[in-house]
Swiss-Prot record:
Keywords, comma-separated and alphabetical: Cell cycle, Cell division, Cytoplasm, DNA-binding
PANTHER family registered for this protein in UniProt: ACREF/ENVCD OPERON REPRESSOR-RELATED, ACREF_ENVCD OPERON REPRESSOR-RELATED
Domain HTH tetR-type: 7-67
SUPFAM superfamilies: Homeodomain-like (SSF46689)
Keyword check for Repressor: no
Protease among keywords: no
Example GO biological process: negative regulation of division septum assembly
Family: Belongs to the nucleoid occlusion factor SlmA family.
Gene3D superfamilies: Tetracycline Repressor, domain 2
Localization, UniProt: Cytoplasm, Nucleoid
Organism from which the protein derives: Shewanella woodyi (strain ATCC 51908 / MS32)
Protein name in UniProt: Nucleoid occlusion factor SlmA
Length: 197
């Protein structure tokens, strides 16, 4: 008889937390509810994480690692400015769509009433993404000698706001309004506007 695979309890706790964020939109997650979902005592949770904030930080680490590593691939593999921007935004939207519970963290909805440093960490992730967008837009100016009519920082902020708005709609609709719906058509319009500037 084969031995059952050993469960990484820490990962299992984070998976349960993400699932609870998805299945309980708008509700606060308590350690008691999480322990019940995981099937352990609250004390057992605290053997793996010293606090609930550290559990959320575990998910935020996953978000940051997943997004930024893929953004770096986009930066390495794609050289066209508009395609880079499109792929970066699509990555963010697809990631949110595939991870509805985690999209509540990106949106900040699940962090209301939690430690301030958690909201700061999410803010830092979005700042890094915006910095990548600025870099992409500035490189176009350097490569082609022709920039945009608006400052690249303003354009990068606008592009990120589009993605953040789509994620916000996704959370507000309780995951019914997918962030990628109509993005292709919207991107065609956005790209036309950017290239006219």
């Amino acid at each position: 008889m084969a031995a059952s695979p050993k469960i990484n309890r820490r990962e299992h706790i984070l998976q349960c937390l993400a699932t609870m964020l998805e299945t309980n939109p708008g509700q606060r997650i308590t350690t008691a509810k999480l322990a019940a979902e995981v099937g352990v005592s609250e004390a057992a949770l605290y053997r793996h994480f010293p606090s609930k904030a550290r559990m959320f930080e575990g998910l935020i680490d996953f978000i940051e690692e997943s997004l930024l590593s893929r953004i770096n691939l986009i930066m390495d593999e794609e050289k066209d400015t508009m395609k880079r921007c499109q792929h970066l935004l699509q990555l963010l939207l697809i990631f949110a769509e595939r991870n509805p519970g985690i999209s509540r963290l990106l949106n900040g909805d699940a962090l209301l009433g939690e430690h301030d440093r958690l909201r700061s960490r999410i803010g830092q992730i979005f700042s890094k993404i915006e910095t990548h967008l600025k870099q992409i837009l500035r490189e176009k100016t350097l490569r082609e000698g022709k920039g945009f009519n608006l400052d690249e920082a303003i354009l990068a902020n606008l592009l990120l706001a589009v993605a953040e708005g789509r994620i916000s709609q996704f959370v507000r609709s309780e995951f019914k309004q997918k962030p990628t719906t109509h993005f292709e058509e919207q991107w065609v319009f956005i790209q036309q506007q950017l290239l006219q500037s």
